[in-house]
Amino acid sequence: MDEYDIVVIGGGPVGLFGTFYAGLRDMKTLLIDAQDELGGQLVSLYPEKIVYDVGGLAGIQAYELAQRLIEQAKMFGPDIKVNELADMIEKTNDNMWIVKTDKATYKTKTIFIAAGIGKIVPSRLGAKGEIEYENRGVYYTVRRKKDFEGKRVLIVGGGDSAVDWALTLAPVAKSVTLIHRRDQFRAHERSVKELFRVANVYVWHELKEVKGDGNKVTQAIIFDNRTKEEKVLDVDSVIISIGYKGDLGNIPKWGVTMKGRDIVVNGRMETNLPGVYAGGDIVQMEGSPKLALIAVGFAHAAIAISVAKKYVEPNASLFAGHSSEMDKFKPK
């Protein structure tokens, strides 16, 4: 059985930075992620959106940010497992931890849980034809803008993501239509105002059925939820943007103290389990407001790894020093 100083659970920004920082502290590291691609929400939800709230970057495409984080995480040669779900953790008699996944079992001295909202699962409407044409015209996010060039696009939803996708695709699509089941939007006012300028908008409307020729989407049937009157729209793509569900799997059964969906940690990012730490969107820090920001998660990761290093090696310094002064970063 492979043995590690630390196992990082979650391959989003916080887990990736934690993996880098563990390598920086000379810890033998394993990173496990349930998705088939590292990067978390940056890659799976909004790869082409611009992220502005990471220090030192005035604006960077989410996918590019993810690639930089992945490159950084790999600097010290960690083991990385993707498409592998951490299923259970167990304490051993020799004060170690066993991490069981759906594919293997690992032994580690410490664990850093950076699972975000969990495995990302799109919310589905349940409309007729939705599942049949999934990934053949029915989508739940926009991975690449160019896939919708010249297409007649129908977007379902009334939140920031739905409105943002409409604004993003309007310049390249043949047409963009957005339907929302209410007349109030959960999006920025300026964006909603622009939406009505660049797209066809139907409020009080819902999706009833997606139709196609067996290979691709050709039409969508929508209806007014007040009058029940139906309309048939000729479309090439349907984007259902009504949110995502985070599947935490068995994490609530691991024995960590939780508050709702959050793992409770102290200022040292320690859970109630010795040697188990957590950070990022999945935590609620005692006495601190919860801010779902990448920048906050980076700080969580640095603190958690530093405390874990001292747990593994009690004589180690809590502070690693400034990277600009480390020999490992100096030109050879």
Swiss-Prot record:
One of its GO terms (biological process) is cell redox homeostasis. Keywords: FAD, Flavoprotein, NADP, Oxidoreductase. Binds 1 FAD per subunit. It comes from the Archaea. One of its GO terms (molecular function) is thioredoxin-disulfide reductase (NADPH) activity. It catalyses: 2 reduced [2Fe-2S]-[ferredoxin] + NADP(+) + H(+) = 2 oxidized [2Fe-2S]-[ferredoxin] + NADPH. InterPro entries: FAD/NAD-bd_sf, FAD/NAD-binding_dom, Fd--NADP_Rdtase_type_2, Ferredoxin-NADP_redctase_2. Its EC number is 1.18.1.2. Its cofactor is FAD. FAD binds at D33, Q41, Y46, A86, I120, D281, S324. Gene3D superfamilies: FAD/NAD(P)-binding domain. It is an enzyme of class 1 (oxidoreductase). Belongs to the ferredoxin--NADP reductase type 2 family. Homodimer. HAMAP family: FENR2. This is Ferredoxin--NADP reductase. It comes from Saccharolobus solfataricus (strain ATCC 35092 / DSM 1617 / JCM 11322 / P2).
